[in-house]
């Protein structure tokens, strides 16, 4: 693991989005999903909910299975954190769930999904909502595939249709609707981030 750790910032929210780990550029940008995969993720959310990246970053708590960039794999792609690294960071996610008491958690990608549902095929979980428990909290869980350009899963069938269904479930969830209707204000008089 390569410091510094990356988090989404001090946002109190009933919605937590959980990613795998920061990529190589996120520590420089000081925010999760700061590069190509993030652009795709925020486009998905904007199309489904109407919320911009700025509004989502201000209203959703961004967490990760691992807090630091895990380094590169021999293939040149980002290395998947190993079980010991995941165990070392698990207390952070547990504590965040204890403190925030989310109503909705959105795990993004296989590694994040596995932390809640075990190892499974994406076809078995994307497009579905689950009631889950962790760290003393009960919440709804709506998984998303990783938005990486390296994986075509979300671009082809059945992935494309399952992703659309998952985004519908997220947009229709009461916790997400509450965020959308919260009237978040941007800096400056009369500016609103949310419709």
Predicted features and spans:
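A polyanion-binding, active-site-adjacent surface
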Residues: 1-179
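Short polybasic linear motifs
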Residues: 185-187
């Amino acid at each position: 693991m390569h410091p510094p750790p990356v988090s989404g910032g001090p946002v109190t929210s009933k919605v937590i989005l959980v990613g795998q780990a920061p990529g190589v550029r996120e520590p420089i940008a000081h925010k999760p999903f700061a590069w190509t995969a993030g652009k795709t993720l925020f486009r998905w959310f904007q199309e489904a909910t109407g919320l911009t990246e700025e509004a989502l970053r201000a209203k959703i708590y961004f967490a990760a299975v691992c807090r630091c960039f895990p380094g590169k794999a021999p293939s040149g792609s980002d290395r998947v954190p190993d079980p010991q690294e995941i165990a070392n960071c698990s207390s952070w996610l547990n504590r965040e769930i204890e403190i925030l008491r989310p109503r909705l958690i959105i795990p993004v990608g296989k590694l994040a999904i596995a932390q809640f549902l075990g190892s499974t095929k994406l076809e078995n979980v994307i497009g579905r909502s689950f009631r889950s428990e962790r760290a003393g909290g009960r919440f709804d869980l709506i998984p998303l595939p990783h938005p990486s350009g390296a994986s075509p899963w979300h671009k082809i069938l059945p992935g494309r249709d399952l992703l659309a269904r998952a985004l519908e479930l997220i947009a229709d969830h009461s916790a997400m609707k509450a965020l959308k209707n919260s009237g978040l204000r941007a800096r400056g008089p009369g500016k609103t981030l949310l419709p």
